[in-house]
A protein has these predicted regions:
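Type-3 copper protein
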Residues: 1-133, 218-528, 572, 680, ...
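Long, low-complexity, charged/polar intrinsically disordered regions in eukaryotic proteins
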Residues: 129-180
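Active-site-adjacent "gating/activation" loops or surface patches in catalytic cores
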Residues: 158-194, 660, 670, 726, ...
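Short capping segments at the starts of secondary-structure elements
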Residues: 194-204, 208-216
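C-terminal structured domains
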Residues: 465-711, 715-716, 733, 737, ...
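Short glycine-/aliphatic-rich beta-strand segments at the starts of folded cytosolic domains
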Residues: 763-798
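Short, glycine- and small/hydrophobic-rich beta-strand elements in well-ordered beta-sheets
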Residues: 804-819
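Helix N-cap motif at beta-to-alpha junctions
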Residues: 827-831
Length: 832
C-alpha cells in the first residue's frame, strides 16, 4: 500500500504543459555511409562530401572544414593538405556524418526542430525542412563596433552607462569576461556617469560636455567618449543583444545618414538571407555562396583567422510537420519526474547557495533586505559566491559527507546487484520508497514551479506508441529548470512565441499575481553566444544585465536596486517599491557558469536554489566506476549503460604502433564486457561507432590521444535504426514542459509566499536600526575605505530559518552532465 501511495504521489507532483518541442536528426539512422580507410582516407572522404545535404551542412557548420573538403577534390589540394590534416578532416567529416543521423541536438542543418502535442492517436509527419537564417552574433558585434569607431555613426546613436560598472578607489571599473578594466573617475568621467544613467543621445551628451568643459575641444571629448564605448563602459542603441528586425532596421537607419554604402550592403545581406531561406536543405549551395560573398564584402578587414573560419551567418532547420504523441507518453514523463523528485536529497545541487545564505544571515540577519548592487560588491557587501571565482575563499559549511552515507551505501548496493546479475538497475516503487527514506529530505517540500525534460522516443511504429509499447531514453541534455528554455531561441522561426509567453507566465508567476516574473537579458561573455540568447521578450517585466535599455521604463527592473532577503529555504528577491517577490526567468540555454555575467548567474541561482532542486538521477558518488549499469524506471531508460575508457586504454592508444593499441582495446572490452556498438559522448555531443570496424577504432583512438580526453562511452540503443520506426528511422527527441502541482486550499505552501500575502509593505527603517550581525568585512586582498552599515534601510517581518542536516554530492567525470540542470562548480567568471 505504501508503494502504491508513493507512486501516486510521484505522478501527481507534475503536470504536462504546452508547447512540446521536437528535436529531429536530419538523416535517418541506419542509412549506409561511405566508409573511410585509414591507410588512404581521401576516397572515403570524397564520397562522404559528395552527399549534397551533408556537404551543405558541413559548410554551414565549419568554414575551415569546408575549405579542407574543397581541397580534397583535387590532387594538388590533397598534397597541400598533407596526410595529417587529411586524416583529421576525414575524422571530423565522419563524426559530422554520424551525428547527422544519431543526434537530434539542433545544430545547423544536422538536426531540426518542430512542435508536438499530446492526443489520442500517434502521428509523425515531419514535413519538409525549412531553413532560418540570421547574421551570426559574433560577426554582427564585430561589425557594429567597427561602425561605432566612425564619428558620423556615433553621433546618431543613444548611449547609456553599463550597469555592470562601479566606482572604487577613485576609478570607474568594469568586470567582463573574467577581467577587470578601469578608467580614472575624474570630473569628465563623473559627468558622463551622471548624464548616462538613462539613455541619452550621443550628440546631446557631447554637446553637454563641450559646454561643461570649455577648455576641452569637441574632438578630444569625442575621442574620450569613443574610448568609453569601445571598452564597454558605455553601451549604445546599436549594441547587439537581441538580433531582430528592429535592431537591423535601426542600424540601417543610422547608416543611411552616416555611411550610405554600408547601409546598401547591409540591405543586400538581408535580401541574400531571405533568398537562401527559400531554398530547401541541400539545394541552396549557390545562394549560400552568394550570401557569404555579400557578408564578407562588408566584413572588418583585420578579422582574425579563427573568426574567419566560422561562417558569418547562423542557420537553423525547422520542421513544419505534425507530431502527435499519445497521452500515455505524457503520463509516463510525469511519473518519472515525480519519482526522481521524491528521491532527490537536499543540497546536492547549487550547494554553494546554502553556504551563501548562511553567511548572509550571519552578516545581515533575517529581518533585513539588502540592495543587490551593494550585496554583490565585495567591498561593501558579501560579494558574489566565491565559487564564481577561481577558488572558493570560504570553506564549505554544513554537516559533511557522512550524512549522505546511507544513500551512498544503498545506491552502491543497487549497482552491485545489477552488475553481478548482468541486468539493469530497476527503480521499482519499493526502491524509490527506500531511496526517498535515505534521502532525508523534507517530504512536504513543494516541487519546482516549472521544469522541462528531454527524452528520445523509441518505438517501432506509431501503432506501437498507441499500444503503449515504447521506451523513453533520457537525453544527455536532461532539460532545464525553466520550462520552455530549450525552445526559446527557436520561438520566432517556429511560431512558438505565444505559447512560450503563456508557459513562462504560468510557471514563473503565481495565481494571485503577487510575484513579478522578469526576463533576464544579458550579453554573453563570448559574442558567438549571442546566437543562443535570441529569444523574444516573453514577459512584461525584464532585468537587463550589461545590455542597453530604457531604465525610465517602470517595467525595466534595475538589478542594482532589487532587494535580497533571507527566506525560510533560501534567499529571495524583492521589488524595492512594492515589496513584491521578483522571480528572474532565463528562457534560453546559455551556459551561465562560463558565458553569463556573474550577476546574471547569481540572479538565476537566487531563483532556483532551494534545499531540493530537481537534478536527475544521481549516482551518489559512484560515477567514477569503470562501468555503470542501465537504469530504468517504468518505460523510461533513465541512464544507458556507461563505460569509462580508463588509464590502461589511454596508454595503449598513445603507444606507438597499431599492435599495442589493438591489444589494449581488446583487453578493455574483455574486462568490462564492452559491446561492439557504442556512442562516444562529450556531454550532449555524441556519435556512434562500431568497434568491429577498423576506421571506427581509429576514431576512438583519436579521442583518447587528445590533449585532455573528456568523454565517456554509452551503449547504442538505436543501432541500425532500432526503435526509430515510428518516425521513419530518424532519431527524435521531445522536450516536455512540466508545471509543479501547487498545494490546494488550506494545504501548506511555501512559508514565504503565504506570509508575503499578509505582510505589511516593505518600509524604510529608522536611522538607528542595525542588523543583528554586523561584520564590516571586505573582499580578501582589498580594503574598504570606510566602514559601512551592511544593512539596507529596509525591514520586514522576520522569517523562520529551517535547520538543515544534509550534505553535498559532487559530480564526476563519469556523470552525464546536463546542459542546464546541473550542480557543477563554477569556472572562473569573477576573479577577485
Amino acid at each position: 500500500m505504501a508503494a502504491e501511495y508513493e507512486a501516486g504521489q510521484a505522478s501527481a507532483a507534475f503536470e504536462v504543459r504546452d508547447p512540446v518541442l521536437v528535436r529531429m536528426a536530419s538523416r535517418p539512422r541506419g542509412t549506409a555511409l561511405a566508409g573511410v580507410d585509414a591507410a588512404d582516407p581521401v576516397p572515403g572522404a570524397r564520397r562522404l562530401a559528395a552527399d549534397p545535404v551533408l556537404g551543405q551542412a558541413v559548410r554551414v557548420a565549419s568554414g575551415s572544414l569546408a575549405h579542407s573538403l574543397d581541397r580534397l577534390t583535387g590532387d594538388e589540394g590533397v598534397a597541400a593538405l598533407g596526410r595529417k590534416r587529411t586524416l583529421s578532416a576525414a575524422r571530423t567529416l565522419t563524426r559530422y556524418a554520424r551525428r547527422a543521423a544519431a543526434r537530434p541536438t539542433p545544430f545547423g542543418l544536422f538536426a531540426g526542430v518542430g512542435r508536438a502535442r499530446f492526443g489520442s492517436a500517434a502521428k509523425a509527419e515531419p514535413g519538409a525542412g525549412e531553413v532560418a537564417v540570421r547574421l551570426d552574433g559574433a560577426w554582427l558585434r564585430r561589425r557594429v563596433m567597427a561602425w561605432l569607431a566612425e564619428p558620423s555613426v556615433r553621433r546618431r546613436v543613444d548611449v547609456v552607462l553599463n550597469d555592470l560598472c562601479f566606482v572604487r578607489d577613485g576609478r570607474l571599473c568594469l568586470r567582463t569576461g573574467g577581467q577587470e578594466r578601469s578608467v580614472r573617475d575624474n570630473a569628465l568621467v563623473g559627468a558622463v556617469r551622471e548624464r548616462t544613467r538613462t539613455l541619452v543621445g550621443y550628440g546631446d551628451l557631447l554637446d553637454t560636455l563641450t559646454r561643461r568643459f570649455p577648455s576641452l575641444d569637441a574632438e578630444r571629448l569625442d575621442g574620450q567618449l569613443a574610448e568609453l564605448v569601445r571598452r564597454g563602459f558605455l553601451l549604445t542603441s546599436l549594441t547587439p543583444h537581441r538580433i531582430d528586425t528592429a535592431l537591423l532596421d535601426g542600424i540601417e537607419a543610422v547608416l543611411d545618414e552616416a555611411l550610405p554604402d554600408d547601409a546598401r550592403a547591409l540591405r543586400d545581406i538581408r535580401a541574400a538571407c531571405a533568398r537562401h531561406e527559400r531554398d530547401s536543405p541541400g539545394a541552396g549551395g549557390e545562394s549560400w555562396h552568394r550570401l557569404l560573398d555579400e557578408v564578407r564584402r562588408l566584413d572588418v578587414s583585420d578579422t582574425d583567422g579563427d573568426a574567419q573560419a566560422r561562417p558569418p551567418v547562423h542557420v537553423d532547420l525547422h520542421r513544419r510537420g505534425e507530431f502527435v504523441l499519445p497521452e500515455t507518453v505524457g503520463r509516463e514523463v510525469c511519473r518519472y519526474a515525480g519519482a526522481i523528485w521524491s528521491i532527490t536529497p537536499e543540497w546536492t545541487t547549487l550547494a554553494h547557495m546554502r553556504d551563501y545564505r548562511d553567511r548572509f544571515i550571519e552578516r545581515y540577519g533575517t529581518a533585513c533586505a539588502v540592495p543587490l548592487g551593494e550585496l554583490a560588491d565585495p567591498h561593501r557587501g558579501l560579494g558574489l559566491p566565491p565559487e564564481y571565482g577561481a577558488e572558493p575563499t570560504y570553506a564549505r559549511t554544513g554537516p559533511g559527507d557522512e550524512v549522505d552515507g546511507p544513500r551512498r551505501a544503498f545506491v552502491g548496493e543497487l549497482i552491485q546487484e545489477a552488475v553481478l546479475s548482468g541486468g539493469d538497475l530497476v527503480l521499482t516503487d519499493e526502491v524509490v520508497r527506500r531511496l526517498a527514506d535515505v534521502a532525508r529530505h523534507d517530504p512536504e517540500a513543494a516541487p519546482p514551479r516549472g521544469l522541462e525534460l528531454c527524452f528520445q522516443v523509441l518505438a517501432d511504429s506509431t501503432a506501437a506508441l498507441d499500444r503503449g509499447d515504447f521506451r523513453l531514453l533520457g537525453s544527455p541534455h536532461i532539460g532545464a529548470w525553466a520550462a520552455g528554455a530549450t525552445a526559446g531561441r527557436f520561438a520566432e522561426a517556429a511560431g512558438l512565441t505565444a505559447d512560450l509567453t503563456r508557459l513562462a507566465t504560468e510557471t514563473s508567476g503565481d495565481p494571485d499575481g503577487d510575484v513579478i516574473a522578469a526576463q533576464v537579458e544579458l550579453l554573453p561573455r563570448e559574442p558567438r553566444g549571442l546566437n543562443i540568447v535570441q529569444v523574444p521578450r516573453l514577459l512584461p517585466y525584464r532585468i537587463p544585465v550589461g545590455v542597453p535599455d530604457d531604465r525610465d521604463d517602470p517595467r525595466c527592473l534595475d538589478w542594482r536596486t532589487l532587494l535580497v532577503a533571507a527566506g525560510s529555504d533560501g534567499l529571495r528577491l524583492l521589488h524595492p517599491e512594492s515589496g513584491r517577490p521578483v522571480r528572474p526567468v532565463l528562457p534560453h540555454m546559455l551556459a551561465l557558469d562560463a558565458q553569463a555575467p556573474p550577476v546574471a548567474r547569481f540572479l538565476m541561482d537566487l531563483a532556483t536554489a532551494r534545499p531540493r532542486v530537481w537534478s536527475g538521477w544521481d549516482w551518489a558518488g559512484h560515477d567514477t566506476l569503470p562501468y555503470l549499469p542501465r537504469v530504468r524506471y517504468g518505460r523510461v531508460v533513465v541512464m544507458p549503460k556507461r563505460w569509462l575508457p580508463g588509464r590502461r586504454l589511454r596508454d595503449a592508444a598513445r603507444a606507438k604502433g597499431a599492435e599495442v593499441w589493438e591489444e589494449g582495446l581488446d583487453a578493455w572490452r574483455r574486462r568490462l564486457a564492452v559491446p561492439d556498438r557504442l556512442h562516444i559522448a562529450r556531454n550532449d555531443q555524441m556519435y556512434p561507432v562500431d568497434l568491429r570496424d577498423r576506421w571506427d577504432r581509429e576514431l576512438l583512438r583519436s579521442e583518447l590521444t587528445a590533449l585532455h580526453p573528456q568523454f565517456v562511452c554509452y551503449e547504442d540503443l538505436t543501432a541500425d535504426g532500432a526503435g526509430l520506426g515510428w518516425n521513419g528511422g530518424h532519431s527524435t527527441e521531445i522536450v516536455v514542459p512540466l508545471a509543479g502541482a501547487r498545494p490546494s486550499g488550506g494545504a501548506a505552501g511555501t512559508v514565504d509566499e503565504e506570509r508575503l500575502r499578509t505582510a505589511p509593505p516593505v518600509r524604510p527603517a529608522p536611522t538607528r536600526f542595525h542588523c543583528r550581525a554586523r561584520t564590516g568585512c571586505s573582499s580578501s586582498g582589498t580594503r574598504s575605505r570606510r566602514p559601512t552599515n551592511p544593512c539596507s534601510r529596509i525591514t520586514f517581518p522576520p522569517c523562520s530559518a529551517r535547520s538543515r542536516t544534509t550534505s553535498t554530492a559532487g559530480s564526476s567525470c563519469g556523470t552525464r552532465t546536463p546542459t542546464r540542470i546541473c550542480g557543477c562548480a563554477s569556472t572562473a567568471t569573477w576573479r577577485r
